[in-house]
């Protein structure tokens, strides 16, 4: 029997400061996360504020996690840390903390691709083998990939402009709903009429599974600009129309992505949807019906682990460690780090 592995995961790629300790038995031994409320006043993440908050709180969260788990650093088998993609300032804070712990304890360090952590967290909760179809929807990314193995992905399509999470945040800002926008728009949409406004469903008449959301964002802005009064009813109707439009786009693109994935590998029969937008219950319902109609099983992480967290970084560390993938101390933060490039990074090392 393989020895139980324990990994400390550190996540500081955006505005969540998160630390977790997980083991290879798929147990969360401790998990601490601090979301920064200061960004709400700006309608989005301010990199300088985010990085300073990571500096202020990360050391305390690491110590709190160690204490809660009733372990010591000698019990940890490796330290996993987000190295990208993300905001450089925040990434530097997390990486320097992880490198310091690794240097002092002599424990291996593993640089984690943030997107891969979103992709692999599903395997902590479901027995799902490779390959599978993957849809990542977050504040910075919206893309379909085929996941063949740890650090081995093939991109099928992605957003040509804005990410879906970014559009949710910007629409919420236009409506003065605050940040983050996704949960608020979902809540308001339940009270509105989705047929109130006709919005563009870009690329849905074209093959492939790329996305384009910039036209949708502009259309919402134009609707708002044409109103004399923005009352609660209007906010709810715009939210409902916007979310219904997003649902139609996702269904169309999923239909195409399923066909494309089956053409690539006939074994693929599961769709994993992850990232912050995957927590949206209304969109989950639309996507689930679509996948089931295509004979695919669709899987989502627990809603609280769709957004950025330390558990997914720790689990990605477990998966990488099992493959023998560890890093030296010379790696650097990356603002951009395409998931499909991971296999080439292995070859270079």
UniProtKB/Swiss-Prot annotation:
Binding site for substrate: 136-140, 169, 182, 280
Keywords from the UniProt entry: Acyltransferase, Cytoplasm, Iron, Metal-binding, Transferase, tRNA processing
Keyword hit for Cytoplasm: yes
Binding-site positions, Fe cation: 114, 118, 308
Cofactors required: Fe(2+)
Recorded GO MF terms: iron ion binding; N(6)-L-threonylcarbamoyladenine synthase activity
Cofactor note (record): Binds 1 Fe(2+) ion per subunit.
A GO BP entry: tRNA threonylcarbamoyladenosine modification
Main subcellular location: cytoplasm
PANTHER family: TRNA N6-ADENOSINE THREONYLCARBAMOYLTRANSFERASE, TRNA N6-ADENOSINE THREONYLCARBAMOYLTRANSFERASE, MITOCHONDRIAL
Full protein name: tRNA N6-adenosine threonylcarbamoyltransferase
Organism: Ehrlichia chaffeensis (strain ATCC CRL-10679 / Arkansas)
